[in-house]
Amino acid sequence: MNASSWSLRNLPWFRATLAQWRYALRNTIAMCLALTVAYYLNLDEPYWAMTSAAVVSFPTVGGVISKSLGRIAGSLLGAIAALLLAGHTLNEPWFFLLSMSAWLGFCTWACAHFTNNVAYAFQLAGYTAAIIAFPMVNITEASQLWDIAQARVCEVIVGILCGGMMMMILPSSSDATALLTALKNMHARLLEHASLLWQPETTDAIRAAHEGVIGQILTMNLLRIQAFWSHYRFRQQNARLNALLHQQLRMTSVISSLRRMLLNWPSPPGATREILEQLLTALASSQTDVYTVARIIAPLRPTNVADYRHVAFWQRLRYFCRLYLQSSQELHRLQSGVDDHTRLPRTSGLARHTDNAEAMWSGLRTFCTLMMIGAWSIASQWDAGANALTLAAISCVLYSAVAAPFKSLSLLMRTLVLLSLFSFVVKFGLMVQISDLWQFLLFLFPLLATMQLLKLQMPKFAALWGQLIVFMGSFIAVTNPPVYDFADFLNDNLAKIVGVALAWLAFAILRPGSDARKSRRHIRALRRDFVDQLSRHPTLSESEFESLTYHHVSQLSNSQDALARRWLLRWGVVLLNCSHVVWQLRDWESRSDPLSRVRDNCISLLRGVMSERGVQQKSLAATLEELQRICDSLARHHQPAARELAAIVWRLYCSLSQLEQAPPQGTLAS
C-alpha cells in the first residue's frame, strides 16, 4: 500500500462534496434529534425513533413526505392490529401465534398488489404489528398493551417529524428538477433508441435496449409521485405528467412498429436509412418545427398509392414525428412553468398487474415461517423467541417483493453479525461508563455522519451501510432507563440472527417461482387481456393496455433467464402492436359495406388465431396468408379507402409474423 492511500484527501470527510455533507448532516442530526426527543419524552425504547428517522432519510422532499405518510399510515394500522389481535388472544399463545401469522401473511399478500407508498404502508402494518405484539407474550397486565402500542407509534412519529424538519432546514435537490431532467433525458434517448431499432440487424443489444427504455419510463412514475408530494404546481400538472409518460410509452411502441415494417418491407426506397438518420438528428434540436420535419421526410412520401407497404410506413413515420414534436412542446411548457390544461387530455395513471399466484405463495411462506418459529419458541420456552419472530417477520414481509431475496437475506445476515460485534463493544465498553445522553451523542454523531458519507462514497456497499445505519439503533438499544445485562444481550442478538437464518431457510424450501414460470404467467395474462381488447367493449383503453403490457415486460428486467425475458418481451411487443392496429381498425370508418366487412373479418381472424392458451401455428400460417391476400386485393381496389385499409392490414401482418418462430405448445412461449 503506497503512502498516497493514507493521505488526508482519501479520508471520507475530505473526499465528500458539499451535497454529500448536506445529506449526511441532515440525516445524522435528524437521527440524533429523534433519539434525544424520544429519550426526554420518557418513551421506553427511544431507539425506534432514531430508526424511524433513518428509514425516511430520502434525498428529496417528495420522497421524505411520501415515505413518511406511508410509514405513519402503516404504523397506525399495525398498532391497531396488534392491539386487537394480542388483546383478544393474549392468554392463548397458540391462537395468538395463529392470528399474528395470518395477519403478517395477509400484509405480505396485500403489499404485492400495490406499489410505492401503499405497498410500503402494508409492509409497515405487518412488521409494526410484529414489533409491538410479539414482545407482549411476556406481559401479564392487559393495560400494558396500550402503553407499548402508543409508545411504538409515538417513537415512529417523532422520528418522522425530526426527519421532515431537517429536510426543511437543510433541503436537498428538487424533485421537480429530477423529474424534468429525467423526462428530457428520456425524450432524447428515444431518438437514440429509434436509431438503434431501425437498423436491419437483430441482436441481444437491441432487446436489452428496448427493455431498458421501458423500465426507465416506468421508473419515472416514481419521480412523478415524489414531485406530486413536493410541490403544488406538480399536483396541478399531475394529469399532464401522466399523459407525458403515456406519450413516451406510445413513442416506444411506434418505434417498435416501424422496425417491424422495415424488416418485412422487401424493397424500401434506397435513401430510407439516410433520411431517417437526418430526421433523428433534426428532432434532437429544440429549434425544429413541423415544417423542417416535413421537408426532411418529403422524399419518403409514396408516389404509388397502391404500394400499401410504403403508405403504411409513411403514415406511421408521420405519426411518430407528430408525437415527438408534441412531447417536445409539452416538456418546454413544463420547464417554463406555463400552465395550460387544454393541450393534453386527462389520462389515468400507468396500469399495473399483480401476479396473484406469487402473492399468495409469498403470504403462505410468511405464515408458515412464523408458525414454525413460534411453535419452536413455545415448545422450548425460549425467552428471546419474540426477537426471532420479529426479525423473521420483517425479513419475510420485506424481501418477498424483491427480485433476489437470497442475496438480500445474506446481506442482512452479514449486517446483523457485524452489528452484534460492534454493539457489544459500544454497549459494554463505552455506554456503561457514561451517565448522560449528551455524552453518548458526542460519540454517536460523528459515527453516523461518517457512515452516511461512506454510504454515498462506496456505491458497491451502499446497501450494507444503509442497513448498518437503520439496524444499529435496535442493537445498541438506548433505553430509558438503560439496561446492561450481558446474558439478555447475547440471547437477544442470537435470536435476531436465528430469525433471519430461519427466514432464509423458508425461502430456500418455499422458493419463489422461477423466472420461467413467472414469464409463462405474465404471457398468459397478456394474451387474456389482448383477447379482451378484441371484444366490442374492451375493459381497458388503448393507453391502459399499453402501459399494462409494458408493466408485464418490466417484471423480468433483472432476470438471468434470457429465454424467459426474450419471449415475454416478444409477446408483449407483438400483442401491443396488434392492439394498436385493432384500435385503428375499430376507429376506421368507410361508407362501403364490403370494406367494413373486410375490416371486421381481419379482427375475427385475430380471434381465431389467438387465445389465452397461445397461438396455433397452423392457424397462424393460414391467417398470415389470408392477411397478405387481403392486402393485395385491397391494393388493386379503386376506392382510396380500400388502399388505406390495405396499409393498416399490412401492419397487422407485420406484427403477427414475429410469432412464426414461437416454440411449440407446452414450452416457455406457450
Swiss-Prot record:
Residue stretches spanning the membrane: 23-42, 47-69, 76-98, 118-140, 153-170, 381-403, 410-432, 437-454, 461-483, 493-510
One GO cellular component, as annotated: plasma membrane
InterPro entries found in the cross-reference section: PHBA_efflux_AaeB/fusaric-R
A Pfam family reported for this protein in Swiss-Prot or TrEMBL: FUSC
Predominant location: membrane
Protein keywords: Cell membrane, Membrane, Transmembrane, Transmembrane helix, Transport
Subcellular location(s) per record: Cell membrane
Membrane topology, as annotated: Multi-pass membrane protein
GO molecular function: transmembrane transporter activity
Annotated family: Belongs to the aromatic acid exporter ArAE (TC 2.A.85) family.
Protein name, UniProt field: Uncharacterized transporter YdhK
The species this protein was found in: Escherichia coli (strain K12)
Record lineage: Bacteria, Pseudomonadati, Pseudomonadota, Gammaproteobacteria, Enterobacterales
Gene that this sequence comes from: ydhK
